[in-house]
Amino acid sequence: VTLTAILFGGLAGVASLVLHWPVPILSGSLVTLVSIFAGGLIGALLGGVWIRRSKYGVERRLLEDYARWLVSEETVLILQGPIETLRFPVAVLRESGDIPPAVFVLHPKRENPIGDVRSPGVPLSPAQIQEHAQRLAMDHEVDPRPRRNAELLRRVENAHQWIHQVCLDLSEASRLEQGAPPTAEWILDNEFVIESNARDVRLNLPRRFYQELPALANEPYRGLPRIYGLAKALVSSAELRVDRENILAFIEAYQSVRTLTIGELWAVPQMLRIALIESIQDLAASALTELREHEIADFWANRLITANRRDPKQLFSILAELAATQPGPSPYFATQLVDHLYDEDAALVPVQSWLERIYRKSLSELNLREQNRQTKDQISIGNAFTSLRQLALLDWRRIFEQLSRVEGLLRFDPSGVYSKMDFDTRDRYRRAIEELARRSGQPEDQVARRAIELATQATREATGDDRRIHVGTYLMGEGRRELARLIPCHEAPRFRVLQWVYRHHSAVYFLGLSFFSAVFISLIVLPGLRGQTPGIRLVIALLLLIPVSQLALEVLNYLVMRLLPPRALPKMDFKVSGIPDAFRTLVVVPVFLGNAETIRAEVEKLEIRYLANKEGNLLFSLFTDYTDSDQAHREDDERLLQTATESLEALNHRYGGERFFLFHRDRTWSASEQKFIGWERKRGKIEELNRLIDGTRPEDADRLVYVGNPDHLSNVRFVITLDSDTQLPLGTARRMIETLAHPLNQPRFDAAGRILAGSYTIIQPRVSPTLPSTSGSLFSRLFADAVGIDPYTKAVSDVNQDLAGEGSYHGKGIYDVRAFSRVLSGRFPEEWLLSHDLIEGAHVR
């Protein structure tokens, strides 16, 4: 007020001098003083009004109310402002004087934005929960119209923000040393649990997926996802305690009447999180209300005690004011007020009479009921936070597959392959069923039945193609068109476009490369050659064609990776059962016998590969050659071979059995090299090994096998070939075997002996450099990235797989021995191939 008075007075004085200049000094001074006084008075009045009406003033209603509630010779100091600004003045007041004043802090009233969303149901027994689920299934009506809004997702975010604000109020009350309800401690200590679960909902329940969930057409959850209604019912009937057992029991009981979709089952954990967060929001609202009622009870108890002690005549007028301001006091307020008046009989008796008239119950009965409610709230909020933690620990993959009706149908796959596949492959099969069901309007379980029927029919037809009796052929393979016609179903435009691109991948790729090359030449080269003759333009354009085409290649590869989905291959799962005998695999590392130290280092690396890939049907070997020489035999050859033999035999002795093999061959004369070398170098090693395994040249066993039993090689199905510097990380060998062992990946041949598209003889995983090697040279630092180095096509080798379904082979991978030999045995002339990897990959796929 003073500041505004000075401001307005100064402005009035300056205005007076300006308006009356020039004037006599005496009269001008008098006018100026009068103007300053009048301006100051106006400023003071305006400042007072502004303070009263602004956030810095105390509301007149508060002044009038508290003036009525004071007793004689009593002073009150009212501070009105944000709750976080009161900590310092409250501390000062509590430390002032020998007898500090009574201090009361009243928090603002916050309304729950979505009201009370807790269902009024009572806890049910397990049998009652299942009956409740069945009744819900009969009552639920699904809205056939698609839902376009995301109201529930907004509610979750608002609930999270609102609970955070409540936590700020509760923590501020704790700093002000105010009494808080018992549930407040749970909320403050576990706010991070709410935050993490709300974040989980945002990440795992995207808007598009949410809008695909079936919605309810009847109340009380009209327009909301059906699975949300189930989650609310389960949370309510289980008293906010959700675990694996009651989730399974509730949903299985519901599905005994009405089947849930695959998407709904995947949304179960997120909907349970939403239901629990909303229940915690209600409990937080109750805690905040109880905090405010506790503060109000403190104040009115102080008023009654003060009136009783200092002016008993005002006791009943204060009580009348209390009854007027609290016409319907809550049981919590009543118990808190009575607790404060416990030793004040004169004040307690009328208050007790007033409360008993309102509730028509005795105070002891009211107090008992309130204690039971508080105990129930503590149990509920403890259950809610425990359930949120439990949801994060559950294996939802196993729960989903246990609940899914589609999963149960697919496990009747006539080939028996489906149940032996890994989870990601089974999930891709189920997503295919979702897509077909969505496009056809048929239930998902009906689509699954049709796929099983086609596979079963193929078993009766005895076509000789094992793929036809596998349900995956009709979901992911060439039989999908047949299934789509049977349903019937019109595939999505995106799916049809992708299939067309896959069938014409070469044309798409080269047309795209030509298009971008032409665009870049026209945009970059031609504008700078204006005024030149056509011949000069043509020459310069041809000279720049290679660098421009490289730029076009990078752009095209980027677009392919961004626009086409990854083409992951289906896989089996041998993690628990181990590699079957039918897929016994040999790991072979071709090396040279250079010196003893090198040999011991190679044996040690082979041992490391074994320790990282301990499997029953996985064998490990070195295939060695002597170094090139002008002589067929050198004097140190026998010593080096003996070192290798003893080292491999030591491994067999250390780990038991005959798991480690040593293959070796002598030098032969090479006319092209004019030296004695190992026949055809690495390609020759692989070819001789294949002949030994497939039985074409069994007599080679005595010549090639130096460590290990050759009889154990006859049942080898696959070979994993590695370079000396290639590691085999933990479990990698098994994952490669699982991929090549899947029926949809196993090699198939046409009548001419050529391998068919969609089947593979070689599976090559991504090859990445180790962390130390990425900084070993300038080249590595420039070209190594998050996906590593590809020796032939740099960092874009996945473009070939995503577009054409096959990649460039560079000598490290797993192959089917007999299919490999069938295609390549005797195909290449001797001493013609320097690098054999690419040409082998081109022939065998």
Show where each model-derived region lies.
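ATP-dependent phospho-/nucleotidyl transfer catalytic cores
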Residues: 117-224, 249, 274, 298-306, ...
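Internal catalytic domains of large membrane-associated glycosyltransferases
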Residues: 309-499, 567-845
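Alpha-helical bilayer-embedded segments of polytopic membrane proteins, i.e.
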Residues: 273-283, 495-557, 765-769, 809
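Cytosol/matrix-facing juxtamembrane amphipathic
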Residues: 1, 37, 41, 45-113
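Transmembrane alpha-helices and immediately adjacent membrane-cytoplasm interface residues
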Residues: 35-57, 543-565
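Membrane-interfacial hairpin junctions
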Residues: 13-34, 527-536
